[in-house]
């Protein structure tokens, strides 16, 4: 998915490196690393090289690196792509808790059902143009977010000519 990590480090080393690179105190970093490994369910893989992680584990370790400094805003690109359902639910809980504590999460996603379930506000952007923005309820306007997205963006494919599929 194009995500670049120092994958010859272990997960623990990568999160630690990220925190120290950002000038954080070593003791604070060490405590947060252990917390992040625990909540991301990566303790068993903490000392394995990131290169050996699955795609879902890559997502979780990247999120841990993004969270180590407790930023006010997290910008995430497809955070649930290639993540198993249990990890997805855990990440959702982590992000919801982060928001409840005052953080802001900006998500870029093509999974409209997840966006509709998780987000309070949404913006639909197509070809660099803002098509709609507001609360999820206002943008959906009585439709599912996926249907509204297709309605706003257009481009639903023609289905004629596939009668041979119904043999």
Model-derived features: positions:
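Catalytic Walker B motif of ABC-type/P-loop ATPase nucleotide-binding domains
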Residues: 74-77
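A short, surface-exposed alpha-helical micro-motif characterized by mixed small hydrophobic
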Residues: 115-117
């Amino acid at each position: 998915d194009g995500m670049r990590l120092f994958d010859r480090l272990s997960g623990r080393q990568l999160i630690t490196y990220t925190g120290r690179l950002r000038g954080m105190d070593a003791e604070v970093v060490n405590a947060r690393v252990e917390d992040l490994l625990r909540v991301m369910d990566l303790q068993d893989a903490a000392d394995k090289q990131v290169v050996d992680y699955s795609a879902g584990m890559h997502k979780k370790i990247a999120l841990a690196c993004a969270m180590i400094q407790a930023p006010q805003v997290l910008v995430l690109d497809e955070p649930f792509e290639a993540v198993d359902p249990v990890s997805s639910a855990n990440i959702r809980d982590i992000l919801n808790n982060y928001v409840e504590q005052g953080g802001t999460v900006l998500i870029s996603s093509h999974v409209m059902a997840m966006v509709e379930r998780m987000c309070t506000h949404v913006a639909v952007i197509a070809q660099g143009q803002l098509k709609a923005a507001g609360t999820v309820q206002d943008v959906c306007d009585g439709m599912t977010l996926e249907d509204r997205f297709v309605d706003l963006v257009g481009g639903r494919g023609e289905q004629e000519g596939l009668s041979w599929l119904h043999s």
